Amino acid sequence: MTDPTGTGTLHESAHAKINLYLHVTGRRPDGYHLLDSLAVFAGAADRLTLRPGAAGQGEAVALDIAGAFGAGLVADTDSNLVLQAARRLRAEMGVTDRLAPMRIVLEKSLPVASGIGGGSADAAAALRLLLRAWPGEALPRARLMALAVELGADVPVCIDQRAARMGGVGERLAPAPALPNCGMMLVNCGEAVPTPAVFRARAPVFTPAASLPSAWPDVGAMVRDLAALTNDLQDAACELCPTIRTVLQVLDAAPGCRLARMSGSGATCFALFDSPQGARDAMTAVERPGWWVWAGGLHGMPAET
């Protein structure tokens, strides 16, 4: 295990994936829906730590789950995408019998099953951790991305945690427009909205793929273009969970909000602001009992303009 700190541990962050818009463009013969979306990553993140495991732990890579949203996942760690990613990577690299035991600790700070790709981001972070831990084992980029697709359509975009245009069922990635350093607020009302139910409830119509510029010079230009687009799952999710509509109304009324919309299939909603500090300043106007609220900037951007 490569560990420049000498502590025997490695760390990765798994950032929230936000769909700034999401068009359902069609449906494949196998029933999977085709999408066009612009995904960005917020500063909000889960944290994964990889450390040496115990000889008798039973599996080459074991998983512990903690954090504010970890309790709901502890009962079913065996099916967690983090462990699935570890198992598939071991098989793909063909090193199963040569691995020292390791343990991943997932600190779950993001709401579960909430439209922000948390499980997919965790799986991608696990892949990055293990590839750092096994530096002598080469894995071509194409094979890594193919493995990511097998884990889930959102996992490929989470590998690099960079803004990207998503197509196909989500696995086809293309460069995103250059983004301004905007602020973002995320709100989750604490109510689960199953993705299959949202797709079943949506109107049976399709929306063409969007036409985007190569760059947005400022937040105003970005908001004007995004306002002309939609999240095609938002209305259906609001019918299933009316609190989402309340969240959107509260966000839209927040001081400095430029755009409010639902991410993915919900229930997390986001609002865009002129700056990260502007988003943080508006938090007190949005916070409600039982709501998870985060405010800041986009991952990879300066914290302030």
From Swiss-Prot:
Residues involved in ATP binding: P111, V112, A113, S114, G115, I116, G117, G118, G119, S120, A121
Active site positions: K17, D154
Pathway where it operates: Isoprenoid biosynthesis; isopentenyl diphosphate biosynthesis via DXP pathway; isopentenyl diphosphate from 1-deoxy-D-xylulose 5-phosphate: step 3/6
GO biological process: isopentenyl diphosphate biosynthetic process, methylerythritol 4-phosphate pathway; terpenoid biosynthetic process
Catalytic activity reported: 4-CDP-2-C-methyl-D-erythritol + ATP = 4-CDP-2-C-methyl-D-erythritol 2-phosphate + ADP + H(+)
Keyword Kinase applies: yes
Enzyme kind, highest EC tier: transferase
Record's keyword terms, sorted: ATP-binding, Isoprene biosynthesis, Kinase, Nucleotide-binding, Transferase
Pfam families: GHMP_kinases_C (PF08544), GHMP_kinases_N (PF00288)
InterPro entries, sorted: GHMP_kinase_C_dom, GHMP_kinase_C_sf, GHMP_kinase_N_dom, IspE, Ribosomal_Su5_D2-typ_SF, Ribsml_uS5_D2-typ_fold_subgr
Catalytic activity, EC: 2.7.1.148
Gene Ontology terms, MF aspect: 4-(cytidine 5'-diphospho)-2-C-methyl-D-erythritol kinase activity; ATP binding
Family assignment from sequence similarity: Belongs to the GHMP kinase family. IspE subfamily.
Record function comment: Catalyzes the phosphorylation of the position 2 hydroxy group of 4-diphosphocytidyl-2C-methyl-D-erythritol.
Name recorded for this polypeptide: 4-diphosphocytidyl-2-C-methyl-D-erythritol kinase
Organism this protein belongs to: Gluconacetobacter diazotrophicus (strain ATCC 49037 / DSM 5601 / CCUG 37298 / CIP 103539 / LMG 7603 / PAl5)
